[in-house]
């Protein structure tokens, strides 16, 4: 659906596209500045109940969700899956996410804490 159900995070790229995480639709919806729906990134079973969206230094879309544990799913801006990470730490429900300059992810949680996750992406090994 091109309509927003429960928007809760937003980021804009340098191509005048607006990326909005939609908690109830389990995805990020992309619109242009005129409000025209362009595409969807993620979906149920991939990005369950997203709490936020960001763009990292590589221009990739990071979608944070906290269905079961904290999950971070990384996509190209076209919507191709790059990688998916799952926290091994069980913590309280998170309500917001932000990216730091070094690529770390900061979560604000229901238990009045901030959680900082650092991740390293390893390039694929060529044959």
Kindly give the residue locations of the regions a language model identified:
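Eukaryotic scaffold repeat domains enriched in small/polar residues
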Residues: 1-127
């Amino acid at each position: 659906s091109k309509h927003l159900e429960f928007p809760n995070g937003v980021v804009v790229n340098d191509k005048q596209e607006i990326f909005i995480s939609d908690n109830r639709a389990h995805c990020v919806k992309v619109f242009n500045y005129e409000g025209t729906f362009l595409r969807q990134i993620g979906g149920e079973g991939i990005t369950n109940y997203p709490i936020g969206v960001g763009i990292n230094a590589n221009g990739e879309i990071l979608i944070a969700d906290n269905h079961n544990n904290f999950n971070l799913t990384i996509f190209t801006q076209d919507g191709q899956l790059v990688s998916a990470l799952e926290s091994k730490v069980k913590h309280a429900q998170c309500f917001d996410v932000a990216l730091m300059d070094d690529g770390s992810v900061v979560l604000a949680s229901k238990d009045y804490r901030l959680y900082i996750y650092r991740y390293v992406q390893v390039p694929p090994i060529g044959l």
